A protein has these predicted regions:
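C-terminal region of N-terminal signal peptides and the immediate post-cleavage residues
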Residues: 6-23
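Extracellular glycan-recognition surfaces and repeat-rich motifs
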Residues: 18, 23, 29-32, 38-73
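Short, conserved beta-strand segments of beta-strand-rich sandwich/propeller modules, principally
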Residues: 95, 158-162
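Extracellular carbohydrate recognition
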Residues: 166-185
Length: 185
């Protein structure tokens, strides 16, 4: 039993120094969310989508006007998917948010967000984080769980996680300014 315990402990996410952060801002303050956030890797879409994997999605002109200046956003077509580059996440990164708007589709179409990581056995896992309901104007997403919904059992443990955005149904969407909460309130 001790040998099995040692193997399991070795397979747990490694305890590591806190993930490197970025410049903190309060992009959702106008909506009652006073939390500090850092931009996700490539999450502004102003320089394209470096490191993102896009299927049925691409950079377009136009963006939200609440959190940042810029002129671009990421459009995700019907059935399309956008996957962020890996981002280091620990328990101190409890949530994430972004801005979204529906470009076309029905009122029952949704934009879903999920988290992708590799588990202890080397299997890629994708778990739901939340969904955005249709709105023809730019709006902040709901606060979606991140670090507090991952298997981070050891103090200081981290995982490389990808944010996955999928257009469900026949709708198309635009997203902009994806932010991660570093829990430094």
């Amino acid at each position: 039993v001790l040998g099995g315990t040692a193997v399991l402990a070795a397979a747990l996410p490694a305890a590591a120094a806190a993930c490197a952060g970025g410049a903190e801002t309060h992009p959702f303050a106008a909506f009652g969310d006073q939390a500090s956030y850092v931009i996700a890797p490539g999450g502004t879409f102003e320089s394209g989508a470096p490191g993102w994997t896009l299927t049925g999605a691409g950079i377009v002109a136009g963006n939200e006007s609440f959190a940042a200046t810029g002129t671009h956003s990421l459009a995700i077509g019907p059935g399309g998917r956008a996957v962020s580059p890996p981002v280091c996440v620990g328990a101190e990164y409890p949530t994430f948010r972004f801005f979204a708007r529906q470009l076309a589709g029905d009122s029952d179409d949704t934009l879903t967000a999920s988290l992708r990581w590799v588990d202890l056995l080397g299997i890629t896992v994708e778990s739901p984080a939340g969904a955005v309901t249709p709105s023809g104007s730019w709006e902040p997403s709901p606060i979606m769980r991140l670090g507090n919904s991952l298997p981070l059992w050891l103090p200081g443990a981290t995982l490389d996680v990808q944010l996955v955005f999928t257009s469900s149904g026949g709708g198309s969407w635009a997203i902009d300014d994806a932010y991660i909460d570093p829990y430094s309130r």
